[in-house]
């Protein structure tokens, strides 16, 4: 109601919601979501989680709209084919993840040729937990993120740092980067979301409090033209800003994610799809927290010992490899 939305697509329709949404055109079937996009549509926010919206985002990139992208999994799965498709059809993808939204605005300020990009991670709930305790991490512990309030899946991804590994891959595809041009560091205060390092030795950074209203509002307004309700950042409230290298023994998903990025092709999709499955098993108590990344690596080796890695996969290639994973997933006892 606040933004006078005319059409709305939802994945699950609940009776109580229907009563509230009578004045809107509501679409509940994902396959019909494209009905919300007509000539009068200016901006589409794509917030379907995981790979459920893979077909839809492929269609949306063909219709020349501005897309606020709150789904990294689809970008990672289709890779540069998606960004090329958007560019070909004059669609604009604006990432809504705080890190990639920061990069988007920093690069649009056009300070000249850049050398590399750094995104930050808070370190999640286990930044200081002894490594010997990782086998005993409970679901409740893993869901307790120190900074962000999120759903279960993304909270687990943040705890394992799979989320950051996926964001590294996403940045490569969104901004057409070489593998050597993107990395991540730990920044516990989560005030700096990304930094762009230029060839002249200058580094620019975007700082704001961790609040998703900031990247979302920037989708609808010029970056400095909208005053939202986020409290102004006062650096004097912080005694220090910390930065640490990522320990891959603590966060093996970062190392695995970088290896997957270098391999390319179907590997990033397989890494992501395996993670979705393995996180669901952890939430059900079937596997341990430390198994999430370990089993991902084991299954990746199995997948590409049995299947050819297609370097420029289309939607059918992705669906086929995901079906193979469903049938042949390895879970150790």
Enumerate the language-model features and the residues they cover.
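Catalytic, metal-anchored helix/loop core of enzyme active sites in primary metabolism
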Residues: 1-333
